[in-house]
Amino acid sequence: MARTFFVGGNFKLNGSKQSIKEIVERLNTADLADNVEVVICPPATYLDHAVSLVSHPQVTVGAQNAYTKASGAYTGENSVDQIKDVGAKWVILGHSERRTYFNEDDEQVAEKTAFALERGVSVILCIGETLDEKKAGVTLDVVKRQLTPVLEKVKDWTNVVIAYEPVWAIGTGLAATAEDAQDIHAAIRDFLAERTSRDVADAVRILYGGSANGANAASFRDKADVDGFLVGGASLKPEFVDIINSRR
């Protein structure tokens, strides 16, 4: 099944009004490959700003987090209704930094995912193992554990993209080999097929999210189950366009 190549840019807690303007203008004027979908995820304070600037038809905007309530006395949280209201289409959920620094667990991530989808916001769902888990040889056990509560709550996977992000590779400059990523992505897809159907699993895009950059992105080109990237630091730089065009 042909799956549209997908590149997400997670700006994390970086950027200013001016730098985000420069990033968006670079994307607006770039010669992007036809067969790619791009989502940029700036800090929440700049969501509206980014949406107002984007003019390229292949580029949309997403948030980096959302809560399980649409409104109420939840100081500091992001509402999916408000994310949608400013024109953003996506939200990143389950990122390892949210799991590590803010103690989000698998069940919370599943609740957030189900709620965002229910309210009409598409989800980039992050899963992945730590270095200790990798060394222990339990990578697949970890990603299956992370996916299981989501599978129990979400029956329609049309608007979900999975990002496999080995925690040991995020922000470290280390990266899984393209071959290793392919093996893990294929196993994730097989697990989805077991729990849903082969048709559903074959339609879900699975991204690689561990220190992808302009230098290594092309090495993933021929990997059948690597459907794109969730990019961190490199999404703030001109090389982001090279990553987007890495399958041209």
Curated annotation (Swiss-Prot):
Binding residues for substrate: N10, K12
KW Isomerase (keyword) present: yes
Gene Ontology biological process terms in this record: canonical glycolysis; gluconeogenesis; glyceraldehyde-3-phosphate biosynthetic process; glycerol catabolic process; glycolytic process
Keyword set, alphabetical order: Gluconeogenesis, Glycolysis, Isomerase
Pfam families according to UniProt: TIM
Active-site residues, Swiss-Prot/TrEMBL: H95 (electrophile), E165 (proton acceptor)
Source domain of life: Eukaryota
EC code(s) of this entry: 5.3.1.1
PANTHER family: TRIOSEPHOSPHATE ISOMERASE
Protein name in the entry: Triosephosphate isomerase
Native source organism of the sequence: Eremothecium gossypii (strain ATCC 10895 / CBS 109.51 / FGSC 9923 / NRRL Y-1056)
Lineage: Eukaryota, Fungi, Dikarya, Ascomycota, Saccharomycotina
